[in-house]
């Protein structure tokens, strides 16, 4: 079938994480035999990275069309309603170009509530089935913002099917919107796979993610101080960039761990995979997650995980592949760090990687998505015939 996947964008050298979730699923679906076209428009203020008009990318059997005219911040000056109409117009413009180049889609597949909200205009105007997948962390909270509540109420009811990436998020959609959703987990990308552990002199911890408060990296210096491991025996690499970079570096320095905890900045997936295969333990200290792709990438390489109990983490971490600790509990995190350090040989890296591939490989996820798409198309075909 032909799938038009509505995405934030396609990962680029300057921003390797932008649109990476969507790209992974697009490549998995293409590998499974579908024609996949990623549709996106860019409203960010990135003049030096963007050319005006359409940009086309074809890679790994996935076609991508991006449209850039004007940063949304300027359109926002005219009010929220005008901004919304502008964004819907841009998406329709990209859709028409995609139809011109690749033919009519069998199904529309949108990621994140904000993009799904705009995808509704395509469904209504062009009479195409629409499947929405949700992995926005704003939904997975006890209380959500009024604007998010309104957007969700105005959007999900138009979906022919809704998917979430974790059972915890599935429960939230029912709680906040009364929506029954399928669960299809995130993908462990093909860049991440088991290799024989290339151990270096020091026991190496690793973490990846944006340097923002939600990711909980500020807990790490405190936890390592409490764990009190021999300083000449370990190191911690944190991969990622963000607004908390300087605060985190200051906390590392003031804890006396400048020579142990290293902020490596942004890396592409191949570089992250190499660093994972050189590491002994992955740490996810997040305060809020849905279903962490970073954890799946570590597991795919066979790296045992220490993770906070949030979102769908219990759906992928068990006693054979890691340890869990309560959110924001520095003492429990320190204890998990010590336990993992002292019991490093208790985890079978090859078995961890094999289990991850069996549950979260691109083929497994593409098969699950295809089943949902086929159900939607068959149901709509039956309605139209009757």
Where is each model-derived feature located?
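Conserved acidic donor-binding segment of nucleotide-sugar-dependent glycosyltransferases
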Residues: 319, 323-330, 339-344
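N-terminal subdomain of nucleotide-sugar transferases
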Residues: 1-57, 374, 380
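Short His-centered aromatic/hydrophobic patch
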Residues: 110-115
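Aromatic "clamp/platform" in nucleotide-sugar-dependent glycosyltransferases that forms part
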Residues: 287
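Conserved donor-binding/catalytic core segment of Leloir-type glycosyltransferases
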Residues: 198-215, 221-224, 237
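Short hydrophobic beta-strand element within catalytic cores of glycosyltransferases
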Residues: 304-307
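Carbohydrate-associated surface elements
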Residues: 168, 187
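Nucleotide-activated donor-binding/catalytic signature segment of Leloir-type glycosyltransferases, i.e.
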Residues: 249-267
